[in-house]
Amino acid sequence: MILEGSGVMNLNPSNNLLHQQPTWTDSYSTCNVSSGFFGGQWHEIHPQYWTKYQVWEWLQHLLDTNQLDASCIPFQEFDVNGEHLCSMSLQEFTRAAGTAGQLLYSNLQHLKWNGQCSSDLFQSTHNVIVKTEQTDPSIMNTWKEENYLYDTNYGSTVDLLDSKTFCRAQISMTTTGHLPIAESPDTKKEQDHPTKPHTKKHNPRGTHLWEFIRDILLNPDKNPGLIKWEDRSEGIFRFLKSEAVAQLWGKKKNNSSMTYEKLSRAMRYYYKREILERVDGRRLVYKFGKNARGWRENEN
């Protein structure tokens, strides 16, 4: 690993490497490790000592950095602390998260054995950006086929998630044995002085659940009578045929067992990100949050 000012692990060569736990060197003493036991951020401490909340923060980080839909990772299957998480085998990850299990397992192994404190890991705006090599193509192909096939109602093109998405994060979905590489100084200079981003129009065939819901509202002629606006100006909408929406989403994601209960559970993960909100006291009624884009009438 190439990192500016990063530490390395001390491994006792007299023991079997597979049964060792990493020990943090003096270079990690500057991190506020103790705060991790009392609500610190997940990347500040070793995964072994994560709380249940920090485990969920880690899962949410993987969703955000890799631009995955919230339904890709079943959070309810990971209601465990870091000690339990680190003891889980690859088979247990696969049982809990399906095709995403191997990706989660690989990332956790990387953090366990190559972990850095946040001061070393997350300096994308001031220091070297760390990238990972491409995930095993066989894993990627399975992931793509099962999670990113578009329904024919949203176009005939099979739009698969580009494998580069998984390499976009600073420390992302890696398999053990892959070494991160550092960007060149020219790339670093561009990162320090980024160009002004261009506003993009929303994708009419959004891959995320909230975009899928938004697109039904914006194109009622394609799927009439499923969802309607309660107050367009405030972004409030109601499900009219909740199970039909769930089945359509399941068809889009190639998941025949999708129900509204599962769909609504996935929607909850957008609350923290302020993309969706639940309207209190009103069944099947939701509201777009401040971070949702593309639903307003005057929005380009």
Swiss-Prot record:
Coiled coil: none annotated. Residues 207-289 bind DNA. It is found in: Nucleus. GO terms for biological process: cell differentiation; regulation of transcription by RNA polymerase II. It comes from the Eukaryota. InterPro entries: Ets_dom (IPR000418), ETS_fam (IPR046328), Pointed_dom (IPR003118), SAM/pointed_sf (IPR013761), WH-like_DNA-bd_sf (IPR036388), WH_DNA-bd_sf (IPR036390). One of its GO terms (molecular function) is sequence-specific DNA binding. Its main location: nucleus. Residues 179-204 are annotated as: Disordered. Transcriptional activator that may play a role in regulating epithelial cell differentiation and proliferation. May act as a repressor for a specific subset of ETS/AP-1-responsive genes, and as a modulator of the nuclear response to mitogen-activated protein kinase signaling cascades. Binds to DNA sequences containing the consensus nucleotide core sequence GGAA. Involved in regulation of TNFRSF10B/DR5 expression through Ets-binding sequences on the TNFRSF10B/DR5 promoter. This is ETS homologous factor. It comes from Bos taurus.
